């Protein structure tokens, strides 16, 4: 039988390893649907472009796991809350931190930006909600009323109300200007995970762990609809941009709801597991979920999803169902009145007055401690090309991120008969999209290959990719031509890589055999496989013996002798292993260690291996922070009267350290010109070593 190809409704777009430790939170940019922020237990916030394998930017500064993230409406800023209760706000276009906000006593569990002003709201596990003025760097008002963690916050489109969902099974509506609660919805029987305002009308949707989605009338403050039949906890809800229907995301399922009367238009089974966020772009729904260190993107073609009462074979054309005899709320319900100007301080006047009455006194001016925290935060651009394309476009009037994106093409779904499984299938044409640097799709590439099943690729996230190759095709029938020039190699071998060094995977692909070539014999094949194995065994055995020797000295409690032993072995890998342990416990550092290890640090900073460079930078940073004041004071002190052997020994050690640090300053200065994470680290070291030039 012939092979039948049909376009599918939903598919997995991509899966990546987003963090070095477990992912703890993520969010999609709702404006473009093409930007993703992920937070992890590694205390980092990583920024991604949907469908691109490499991280664009990595934001650091938090000292505990990131509990919640949110973009603003223009996707130019991102705020992240940590488990320690602190908030950090970054400007993505300027690649710098704007604010560090402190005040919550427990972890941040929800965030949202005000749609028209420099305000943001945060909810915490401590059950409090706080409204922050980013410009004043302080808390404007605190809303109290929930008894358990606040899981979701949402501002109304006109910016006058704030809705909050909590583990206490309630949804509360707050008046921002009056600074008080308007009403409370209590129909849910379990924790409420998400709330969402209708884009135009006075409606509010909520999704709960009780497996229901409820709709609330914000004029009469009553429930007008409740879903039935959800198979799992409702983790995300989203109104269609035109407000015609409501999407609900639960475990492996997307449902489409209407209201007045209540009805479920469609159910789409998607293998996304526990979906975390939804966004709509180009009539496609982009969904994300995470598990451990992995993040997965999914796409649902909304053209093939039923969003009303009529359906036509193939693509679904939405037509409104006949209106019932009673007037529908969708035609008579009040709409939001959006102000033409941005939210000003006058609108929040009452809230500011309430802040003055607040017993906490959280409104404060920037202090030296805040400035120190801001300096400790950084934005590491790990993919400069994508960063400039998305956040720093050449045209001043273009939006950021770009809004004119093409929809993701759906893969082909193959239907096989039993006879097809018994013999090789016919050759079919697979259409592969080509994605340019802006994340937009170019013309497809057509290739003829026998394909059984196409699965998405799991891509490990590298802090800095070795090379970025962009392919383009002018027509479907033309072969792909690599139009980009290869970047000059930095000579650094990344510590996080997904292929062995010096091994070309293409050598293992099948090639056309030369007719004159003779088949390789069994003995020759085994010899080829074992080539290099004996050398590797000897090297690993030697390294194991060296580590055992260092460990035996370390067990006696003599750190200096064990480090000298590692240095004498003339093996940088042993030195790196010992330094990594000492760096974890800075109290082990002594001035004696500095004189022994500084020459080794110079070698580490010039190494080809990223892990060696990182260890060397960390060790040098600790030495400068802990011992530079002592070295400087000792060398600048006037000569003492009499003989002081201890002081003389200390003076000689400080003099030796100073000489070695001067040599290292030239290495650091040359390395500071690099781009990306290493460049920022060396520039930080250059600042710490600035006193050496005086």
From Swiss-Prot:
The keyword Protease does not apply. Residues 350-378 have a biased composition (Basic and acidic residues). Residues 470-481 have a biased composition (Low complexity). One of its GO terms (biological process) is cell division. It comes from the Eukaryota. Disruption phenotype: Results in a significant reduction in midbrain size. A wide spectrum of defects in gastrulation and formation of anterior structures are noticed, ranging from milder microcephaly to more severe anencephaly and early embryonic death. Keywords: Cell cycle, Cell division, Cytoplasm, Cytoskeleton, Microtubule, Mitosis, Repeat, WD repeat. WD repeats lie at residues 18-58, 61-100, 103-142, 145-186, 188-226, 229-269. Residues 319-410, 470-492 are annotated as: Disordered. GO terms for cellular component: centrosome; cytoplasm; katanin complex; microtubule; spindle; spindle pole. CDD domains: WD40. It is found in: Cytoplasm; Cytoplasm, Cytoskeleton, Microtubule organizing center, Centrosome; Cytoplasm, Cytoskeleton, Spindle pole; Cytoplasm, Cytoskeleton. Pfam families: Katanin_con80, WD40. The keyword Repeat applies. One of its GO terms (molecular function) is microtubule binding. Participates in a complex which severs microtubules in an ATP-dependent manner. May act to target the enzymatic subunit of this complex to sites of action such as the centrosome. Microtubule severing may promote rapid reorganization of cellular microtubule arrays and the release of microtubules from the centrosome following nucleation. HAMAP family: Katanin_p80_B1 (MF_03022). Belongs to the WD repeat KATNB1 family. This is Katanin p80 WD40 repeat-containing subunit B1.
């Amino acid at each position: 039988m012939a092979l039948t190809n049909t376009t599918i409704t939903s598919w997995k777009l991509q899966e990546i390893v987003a963090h070095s430790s477990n992912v703890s939170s993520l969010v999609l940019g709702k404006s473009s649907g093409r930007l993703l922020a992920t937070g992890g237990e590694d205390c980092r916030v990583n920024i991604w472009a949907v469908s691109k394998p490499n991280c664009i930017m990595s934001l650091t500064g938090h000292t505990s796991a990131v509990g919640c993230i949110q973009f603003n409406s223009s996707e130019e800023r991102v705020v992240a809350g940590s488990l320690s209760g602190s908030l950090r706000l970054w400007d993505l276009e300027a690649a710098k931190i704007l604010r560090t906000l402190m005040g919550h006593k427990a972890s941040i569990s929800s965030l949202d930006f005000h749609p028209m002003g420099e305000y943001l709201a945060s909810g915490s596990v401590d059950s409090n909600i706080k409204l922050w003025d980013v410009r004043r760097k302080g808390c404007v008002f605190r809303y109290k009323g929930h008894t358990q963690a606040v899981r979701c916050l949402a501002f109304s489109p006109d910016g006058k109300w704030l809705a909050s969902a909590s583990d206490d099974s309630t949804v509360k509506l707050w008046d921002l200007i009056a600074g008080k609660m308007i009403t409370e919805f209590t129909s849910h029987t379990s924790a409420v995970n998400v709330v969402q305002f209708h884009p135009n009308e006075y409606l509010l949707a909520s999704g709960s762990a009780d497996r229901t989605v409820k709709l609330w009338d914000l004029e009469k403050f009553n429930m007008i609809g409740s879903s039935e039949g959800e198979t799992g906890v409702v983790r995300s809800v989203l109104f269609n941009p035109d407000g015609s229907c409501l999407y609900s995301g639960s475990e492996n399922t997307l449902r489409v709801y209407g209201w007045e009367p209540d009805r479920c238009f469609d159910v789409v089974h998607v293998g996304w597991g526990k979906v975390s966020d939804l966004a709509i772009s180009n009539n496609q729904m982009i969904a994300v979920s995470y598990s451990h260190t992995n993040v997965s993107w999914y796409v649902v073609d909304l053209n093939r999803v039923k969003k009303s009462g009529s359906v036509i074979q193939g693509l679904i054309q939405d037509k409104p169902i006949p209106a019932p005899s009673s007037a529908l709320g969708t035609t008579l319900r009040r709409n939001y009145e959006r102000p033409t100007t941005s939210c000003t301080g006058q609108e929040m006047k009452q809230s500011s007055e309430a802040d003055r009455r607040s017993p906490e006194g959280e409104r404060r001016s920037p202090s030296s401690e805040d400035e120190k925290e801001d300096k400790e935060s950084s934005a590491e651009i790990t993919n400069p090309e994508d960063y400039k394309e998305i956040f720093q476009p050449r045209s001043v009037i273009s939006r950021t991120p770009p809004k004119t994106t093409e929809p993701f093409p759906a893969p082909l779904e193959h239907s096989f008969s039993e006879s097809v499984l018994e013999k090789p299938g016919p050759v079919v044409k697979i259409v592969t999209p080509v994605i340019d640097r802006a994340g937009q799709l170019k013309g497809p590439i057509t290739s003829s290959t026998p394909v059984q099943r196409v699965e998405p690729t799991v891509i490990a996230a590298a802090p800095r990719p070795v090379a970025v190759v962009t392919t383009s095709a002018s027509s479907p029938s033309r072969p792909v031509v690599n139009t980009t020039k290869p970047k000059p190699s930095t000579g650094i071998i990344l510590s996080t890589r997904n292929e062995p060094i010096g091994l070309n995977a293409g050598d293992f692909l099948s090639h056309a055999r030369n007719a004159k070539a003779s088949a390789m014999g069994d003995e020759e094949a085994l010899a080829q496989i074992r080539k290099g194995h004996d050398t590797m065994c000897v090297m690993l055995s030697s390294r194991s013996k060296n580590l055992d020797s260092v460990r035996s000295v370390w067990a006696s409690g003599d750190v200096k002798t064990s480090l000298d032993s590692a240095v004498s072995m003339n093996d940088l890998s042993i030195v790196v292993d010992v330094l990594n342990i000492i760096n974890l416990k800075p109290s082990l550092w002594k001035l004696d260690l500095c004189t022994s290890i500084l020459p080794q640090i110079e070698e580490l900073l010039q190494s080809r291996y990223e892990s060696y460079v990182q260890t060397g930078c960390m060790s040098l940073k600790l030495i400068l922070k802990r011992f530079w004041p002592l070295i400087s004071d000792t060398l600048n002190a006037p000569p003492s009267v009499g003989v002081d052997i201890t002081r003389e020994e200390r003076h000689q050690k400080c003099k030796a350290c100073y000489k070695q640090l001067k040599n290292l300053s030239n290495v650091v200065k040359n390395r500071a010109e690099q781009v990306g994470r290493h460049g920022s680290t060396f520039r930080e070291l250059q600042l710490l070593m600035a006193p050496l030039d005086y």
